[in-house]
Swiss-Prot record:
GO terms for molecular function: ATP binding; ATP hydrolysis activity; RNA binding; translation elongation factor activity. It holds the Pfam family HEAT_EF3_GNC1. Ribosome-dependent ATPase that functions in cytoplasmic translation elongation. Required for the ATP-dependent release of deacylated tRNA from the ribosomal E-site during protein biosynthesis. Stimulates the eEF1A-dependent binding of aminoacyl-tRNA to the ribosomal A-site, which has reduced affinity for tRNA as long as the E-site is occupied. Assists translation termination by stimulating the release of nascent protein from the ribosome by release factors. The lineage of its organism: Eukaryota, Fungi, Fungi incertae sedis, Chytridiomycota, Chytridiomycota incertae sedis. It is found in: Cytoplasm, Cytosol. Residues 1063-1075 have a biased composition (Basic residues). Gene3D superfamilies: 2.40.50.990, Leucine-rich Repeat Variant, P-loop containing nucleotide triphosphate hydrolases. It comes from Gonapodya prolifera (strain JEL478) (Monoblepharis prolifera). This is Elongation factor 3.
Amino acid sequence: MPPKKSNARNASLLKEAVTNAGRSDTASTAREGSIAATFVSDSDSSTTASGPVDEKVAAVAELITTLTTNAASDKRQSAADDIAKFVEAEGVAQMVKTKILHGIATGLHNTKQPVAREGAITAIETLIKSPVSKQIEPYMITFIPVLLERLSDKAKTVCLAADSALKALITRLTPYATKQVLPLLLAGIEYSQKWQTKVGALELMQSLSKTAPRQMTTAVPDLVPPLSEVMHDTKAEAKNAGRQTMEAICELINNKDIEKFIPALIDTIANPEKVPDTVHLLGATTFVSEVLPPTLAIMVPLLSRGLNERQTAIKRKAAVIIINMCKLVEKPQIIAPFLPRLLPTLEKIQDDVADPECRQVCQNATKILTKVGIPAPGTVMDDSYEFKKLDDKALAYLKKAIGHQQITEIPEAYRPVLEYLEHIAAAMVADGNMDNDDWNGSIIPTLKAFIPTEGTVTNAVKEFRELSFGSNVKEAVAEEEEDDAEELCNCEFSLAYGARVLLNRTHLILKRGHRYGLTGANGSGKSTLMRAIANGQVEGFPPADQLKTVAVEHDLDGAHEHDNKEVQAFVLEDPVYAHLPKETVVNMLESVGFKGPMATRPVGQLSGGWRMKLALARAMLHNADILLLDEPTNHLDVINVAWLQDYLIGLKTVTSIIVSHDSSFLDIVCSDIIHLDNFKLKRYRGNLSKFVEAVPEAKAYYELGAAQQTFRFPEPGMLEGVKTKERAILKVQNAVFQYPGTDRRQLNGVTFQCSLGSRVAVVGPNGAGKSTLIKLLCGVIEPDNGVVWRHPNLRIAYVAQHAFEHIEKHTNLTPNQYIQWRYQTGEDREEMEKAARQISAEEEAAMKKVQVISGEKKVVDSVIGRRKLKNSYEYEVSWVGKLSNENSWLPRDTLIEMGFLKKVQEIDQAEAARQGLARPLTQKEIEKHLSDVGIDSEIGTHSHIRGLSGGQKVKVVIAGAMWQRPHLLVLDEPTNFLDRDSLGALKTAIDAYGGGVIMVTHSREFSEAICKEVWKVDNGELTPTGHNWVSGQGSGPRLEDKNKDEEVFDAFGNKIDVAKQKSKLSGKDLRKKRKEREARRKRGEEVSDDDE
């Protein structure tokens, strides 16, 4: 809650009024520092001199006497009218000198004579309604505290008069004077013991909400706390008025996200037991509007109470609302006053609550509150809702104008005018209002009493306005560079995706021929913004008939429907290009490399790089004004990347917006960088290197090691017989593979091996066979010829080039649910779907052959399990028509010769999976695993996969693959979709990972930072360099099992007690044991067989 703003002066004025209500007339007249004395200058001795002034003083004194003593109301009104006419004719200076205000104040404080009080109030109301009301408004404001007290006067007529006068003043009040009046009204609520005074002050606030809505809106943070207290007042009238005023004030809050919940928010203030229901209600809200102090003022009481609820779910949801709202706060000064209500409670929850997820959410809320609400060192806090002292030069000028050159000491009688104009000017400066008409309308009516000449007073206000702004001028929007490029777009918009806000009231300006690099973290909304532009969903963006915008995304939409069509026919038969001459289409296809056989190749046989080229060619046939390129270098080799760079730079009349994590590509191509951060788009002139100079935290674009994120991969388990990281755990010899229906081999006699220490980069041009090689290594495909050997317990994690294929059938699940589905049977369900696991018809027939075992003919029913046999394994086999006690154990080689290779591999994979899945498949364990690859619990457990960004989906795929603690991690184009910070985190995780890593990538920067070994693939042949292949264990350091002390769990989270293996005794120990047994026998002790 912001601190109460009722200053000491306002409180003392009210207390003074209350105290003086019981004094005698003489005492109230003589008191020093009273309200009446305010209007008498210490140097005003000239009023006693003889002459015209004496006559005016006498005439005014007679009117004051009639006003405060005459019992007839019409006589008192007549006297009040004459006083108003006198002030109108003679001006403010004569009003002060003739002590009119002094006389009114004296009558107002006359506690013995109701007629005096009523007459004084009549004069006040008459002056307020007179033509000179604006000139004397500063003085009328000073009567507010006493008039509020007169609302509870014993004389009913005085109460009614005070009520009428206050309403007349408030309805005519200059709007920008609201900031000066509100503390006086708040004092009436907070310090008065009379309910009539409270109700009156509350009703005046309601009036102000109609006459000065803009000014009252900025004051909402000051008003909500005291109004909340009044809503619990013991007096029903005050309580009801407080509720009505709160409703009137909250109607001013301009936030479409919460406006329908405002009645419920007010209800929770009056009825705290409704807090849980309201928190649930707001927890399902998508926040897209900018959050300002008025919104926080009504939300923070609910959130504070929500954090203090007993239910953990309510605490968590309140913290989530805080996170979502903080993302829409632009400046620290907006939220800083509310931090004391939220931060201590959030920090306490982190220490006290048992639920780790709730603690994590509260920790995240604390971080974002601290980041948003506590400014960086050197930042100047600018609270627009506090009264700010004017610039000294402006104040000096104002004193000069009012005091007629008496700059050093202005007459005390004019002090109310000075304070009034200072408040108005400060309020207009805080509002950023430099409009001449507003300044003239607010200040000239009062200032012209001191500068009567119209031209002079107008110039004075102009100079005063300029001096008032002084150093408080708000930061102007940076001007666009001065060039002659045509402006294609200039719009302000917000953007949300599902329940997540991506951009909030941000500007987008695009110019013809510029090439904009769109940067930002994964999940910040880059691809969503591109799609929104392409689909015409950006508010204010020119429509398609005015501006041709074409999107080039990372794959061909609907390409699966046309897999069998030839490339050239695929484009020519598309209705979109029917109006183009065939020659134009053919030339465009040839320009990106589709010549000769490539032009007639089926779309389904194109590699990822060729698919991207086809997408680019199709986009360029549109003759677009704006090209939207989302990761255009994905799947492109170095030659094609260079071609794309040259092509884009050569488009002098076409604007490009590019999302790419290829730093060298952005450096060469971009003329500008548009950075997406904190829900805003900010443009930086120059290429990526210039951007990094301006934003040092973006250093990760150049240095992968500078990443702020960190990933961590689980350590792989031990493999039997593997003592060092150099020993081969996978070997391929002379493997040959050719896709059916193709005219050449994709792999031709390739030989390689992998170990736990492998760090391999697979490189080569598009279509050379890199992805095919990886699929062979992982068992997705089997070779037509050659030998593939994998360690029987080897676990391989594979992230495909089109990583989304792993999760495309599970987009309605959360990442947490996806991992639970994938491993719920104890095995990797994706692994079971691989081609290497599927049994062909020929293999099925071979397995049904009759086998002769120990002279008996038998048919294999199934392979059940395995056990160790010297340096290999033997497998338990059940037979058709035989009981289980007749099962046999056959060596591995025997079963393979019988045609049961895939069944043997199935048992091996199941055993390997069992060893790798020794961890509980529970929500909490999976959340921890997901957090190790940069997916927090809010996304991992509470967001569906379909709502995630491309980079977040890739992280989910990596997490899913790493759950089984693999020995080999295979990444096909890992740099696709991941932002630079995530790539740096991935590099760090790979460096620390205890297993082998094989990756296909065109990113030389990424591969060189990680890989020592390079496999160059070209025309289906493999040329390895930098490898260290050994035939045995090698000479490296011996491995230690880092997971040996970890507890083992089944898939349901139940702990498994693992018996420790007994170490084999040496010969010396065995001989010692025998001697001990013989000695025990000689002593007559029994020695069991177990002891033997």
